[in-house]
Amino acid sequence: MVLIKQIVRFILVILFRVEVEGIENYYLAGKRVMIIANHTSFLDAVLLSIFLPDRITFAINTEIAKKWWVSPFGKIVRLFPMDPVNPLSIKAFIKDLEQDKRAVIFPEGRITVTGTLMKIYDGPGLIALKSGAMILPIRIDGAQYSIFSRLKGIERRQLFPKIKLTLLAPQKIELDDEIAGRDRRAAAGKILKKIMTDMIYSTSNNHLTIMDKLLQARAIHGAGQVVLEDVERQPLNYRKLLLKSSVLSRLMARQTQEKDVVGLLLPNTNATVLSFFALQSIGRVPAMLNYTAGYKGLLSALETAQIKTVYTSKRFIELAKMDDLIALLNEQVNIIYLEDLKQMITGQDKAYGIACSLLPKIIYAQQWHSVQPDDPAVVLFTSGSEGVPKGVVLSHKNILSNMIQLGTKIDFNKNDVILNALPLFHSFGLSTATLVSVLNGMKVNVGKTSEKRIGKSDSGA
């Protein structure tokens, strides 16, 4: 059996480039251990049985245990058929764990059909509590993109995606003796759910820049995945988004300096999002200006963030009746209209955009070396309702960490369509609605800005 295990391990490493991190935690957990893992695919049990030391026990549904293909698997691991609704079955499993066994159980009870955590049942938490077993959380990542998952039509599945197993520090569920009955079961289940969600968060990679994450999303979901649309009904997929933002970035690079904070005074349109990513790709920091703040509010924001250049739109200024406001701001900063940039595009700019849309990792790698995850990614501003608007600097890591936290609580996938009813200068409008969507393969419609409201708000400039 050892030889078979080694052969299967070799094959899996070659095909799926399997990486195991934190194996020392397996031994730190001791002998009486309940191993819990997220359930991503039919490969999960094979991966755990092959890459974990020893011959471990697998809790398996009694109906699944009757399948013909389960029998060969039982030669590598020890199978423990369980009926999840039968109290006697659970008691038997607890007694088995008390014999200082290491056993694997999937708290979700089934393979995910959303790509994220499914409902986590209380039973495994109660088992860990009553048996006194240490809990060893293991994150399985990558198998959800394989053909062995149940995400057909939800994720872009691959034949041999890279798979990583991460073993976290062992934990133990402990409760006060005063908690009894159903409350005790529920409390144990609640702790287990927290362990699972914390596991997903702590093993997700937030040490990236926004552009790194954009390219990662393109690779996962495909260049043709539509992710952006506005009221003009001209949807953009990853390929077009990278093409247009890359051309725009060349023009902006000639007008600004690296690490400059650059103002965007724009409504909710594709052009605003393209401008945001264009600035990201050349190491500038976008500052999302609140066009309803009036002259004093905007001037304060410009001074606070030390903004020297602001990009806006002639059409937007005209519809919003902000000509007087822009004339005043133009005395303080350099106002550049996106419409004017179109006249500056050269053949080299277009060629660069095409190259970036086809080979983004190769082209962009030369530009991003100076941008780090902890560097500022965007500057937002408070409403000013309690005084002068304050600048809020968010790093790339801040934004991606918030996105990961959201993903542990909400099921979303590339088939979802998000309507962003908030302005892009709003933290939720930019990060929660727009960036979460674009960076996860979902299509976001950035809605429509109310010109009437803008004009009224700025009339006192």
Features from the language model and the residues they span:
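Conserved pre-ATP/AMP-binding loop-to-beta segment of ANL
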Residues: 335-381, 388, 411-417
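Conserved AMP-binding/adenylation subdomain of ANL enzymes
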Residues: 400-417, 425-461
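A cross-family acyltransferase "interaction/gating" segment
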Residues: 22, 98, 102, 115-179
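Conserved structural elements of the adenylate-forming
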Residues: 10-13, 241-247, 359, 364, ...
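Conserved AMP-binding/adenylate-forming
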Residues: 251-293, 421-423
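Structural core segment of the AMP-binding/adenylate-forming
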Residues: 254, 281-354, 461
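Conserved AMP-binding A3 loop
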Residues: 235-239, 368-370, 377-401
